[in-house]
């Protein structure tokens, strides 16, 4: 199929009270955040999307859904290796290497969130990468052997259901708190680049609407939306 997100988006009927999942061995048009594409060797990685109708999540706090999805991937990967963190806004890292990317698409109507589709790509068994992605890694490369993709999928789904239930109960601080503790570069100063150039910054928080807040070495607070800042790795 072209992409699991598109497949779910085009469904004519679905159960609004259930989690609907689409899985693919290969995607011809797999996407990451913005204009980025996702490289995946057929039959090697885990490519899937989950669709839900969380009408009870406040529109101004919809980034909580991204947090829940990213945490689910982290929990699943934590069972195989250490060093897993969440790189704002939508990547999962093993130390300084990217092992997973996520893409959330939300449909909104006059009442708030109508539907949410969360696309996930996890590098499971691919060992050679040919795109211009600077730092990919797979579970097989980390562990030295292949991993059952179905097992990884089940672990992600189980973890997501746990966090989704917390959101359903309006335990927003629990989800957000765990997300903050799981962030890549949560401590210390690191190199970043924005429209004005490179700078060293330290993490402050991720706001409810998803903005990343940093402060630089002059103490200036900086706020960024998606796509407005680049993480400089190994600088």
Language-model features: locations:
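N-terminal lobe of the biotin/lipoate ligase/transferase fold
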Residues: 1-79, 146, 221
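A generic fold-level signal
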Residues: 16-17, 43, 87, 112, ...
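General beta-strand structural signal in soluble alpha/beta enzymes
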Residues: 24, 84-88
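Long, positively charged amphipathic alpha-helical accessory segments at protein N-termini or as interdomain linkers
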Residues: 55-60, 64-84, 94-235
């Amino acid at each position: 199929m072209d992409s699991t997100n598109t497949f779910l988006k085009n469904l004519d009927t679905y159960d609004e009270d259930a989690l609907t999942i689409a899985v693919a061995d290969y995607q011809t048009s797999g996407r990451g955040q913005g204009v980025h594409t996702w490289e995946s060797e057929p039959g090697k990685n885990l490519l899937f999307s989950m669709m839900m109708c969380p009408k009870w999540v406040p529109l101004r706090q919809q980034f909580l859904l991204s947090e829940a999805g990213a945490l689910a991937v982290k929990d699943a990967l934590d069972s195989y290796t250490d060093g897993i963190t969440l790189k704002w806004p939508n990547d999962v890292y093993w130390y300084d290497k990217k092992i997973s990317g996520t893409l959330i698409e939300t449909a909104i109507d006059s009442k708030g969130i109508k539907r949410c589709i969360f696309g996930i790509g996890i590098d499971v068994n691919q060992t050679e990468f040919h795109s211009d992605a600077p730092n990919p890694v797979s579970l097989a490369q980390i562990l030295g052997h292949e991993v059952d993709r179905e097992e990884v999928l089940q672990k992600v789904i189980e973890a997501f259901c746990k966090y989704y239930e917390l959101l359903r109960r309006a335990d927003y601080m629990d989800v957000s708190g765990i997300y903050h503790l799981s962030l890549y570069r949560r401590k210390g100063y690191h190199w970043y680049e924005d429209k004005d150039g490179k700078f060293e910054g330290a993490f402050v928080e991720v706001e409810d609407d998803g903005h990343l807040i940093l402060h630089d070495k002059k103490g200036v607070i900086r706020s960024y939306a998606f796509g407005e800042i680049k993480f400089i790795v190994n600088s």
